[in-house]
A protein has these predicted regions:
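Bacterial N-terminal signal peptides
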Residues: 7-17
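Positively charged n-region of N-terminal signal peptides that target proteins for export
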Residues: 1-5
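N-terminus-centered regions that define maturation/targeting leaders and the start
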Residues: 21-225
Length: 225
């Protein structure tokens, strides 16, 4: 039987704090490493995943293997392109898919780098820079409807997690403000998650990397006008 950890989701959402619209200034490899998230930090996206060891859902990328470094072209120091992805093992009864890329910063805040929802369950892969495979939500890194490429100003290796959720029904976001943020998506997913799969990627900014001006979509308040 699928054991779910979603019972704590409502409480987690109430306490969810997102970072300011800029990439983190502090480095860190993760829990236990200097500069990593504080002890007891709650990873809100991870908390939504069901604890199903028998799940067949698998998320991969032809550009990067799980646990390896994200190629430069998919970061803010390269092309800022979103990575190509593929998945297999979508469970029977799946009616919708959700994709979230996030990072737990040194202050324990969940940063959303990529949010795609209402993905057709028949979809099995997406190309580099794809935007037409679902609906895109807000990236909290820059407060824009976009894929926010890893571009941290802080030193050290950082981990970013892409999670694919298989849902038994489309998340009801009819009452959510537009453009959509991750909070209502996670809330609407409650009780509908059949399976979830992660792809963990790492990135360390090159020494002496300079800031560059990037063409970006309008911020949330600008997009609403």
């Amino acid at each position: 039987m699928l054991i779910r950890s979603l019972s704590v989701l409502t409480c987690l959402l109430a306490a969810l704090t997102f970072a300011a619209p800029a990439d983190g200034k502090k480095g860190g490899k993760g829990k236990g490493d200097k500069g990593g998230p504080p002890a007891g930090a709650v990873d809100n996206v991870a908390a939504a995943k069901p604890a199903d060891k028998n799940s067949t859902l698998k998320l991969t990328s032809p550009a990067v293997k799980d646990g390896e470094a994200l190629p430069l072209e998919f970061t803010g120091d390269g092309e800022s392109a979103s990575p190509p992805l593929a998945w297999t093992g979508v469970p029977k009864g799946t009616q919708s898919l959700v994709l979230i890329m996030h990072h737990l910063d040194p202050e324990g805040k969940t940063k959303i780098y990529w949010l795609m929802y209402d993905i057709d369950p028949k979809t099995t892969s997406v190309a580099k820079n794809a935007t037409d495979f679902g609906k895109m939500g807000i990236s909290t890194v820059h407060d824009r409807v976009e894929y926010a490429p890893p571009h941290s100003k802080g030193p050290g290796e950082k981990k970013y997690v892409l999670t694919l959720f298989a849902l038994s029904a489309k998340p009801d976001l009819s009452k959510a403000e537009s453009p959509v943020t991750v909070e209502p998506v996670l809330a609407a997913m409650k009780g509908k998650i059949l399976a979830a799969a992660d792809l963990n990627v790492l990135y360390t900014r090159p020494a002496g990397a300079s800031e560059k001006e990037e063409k970006r979509p309008p911020r949330r308040e600008e997009a609403a006008k």
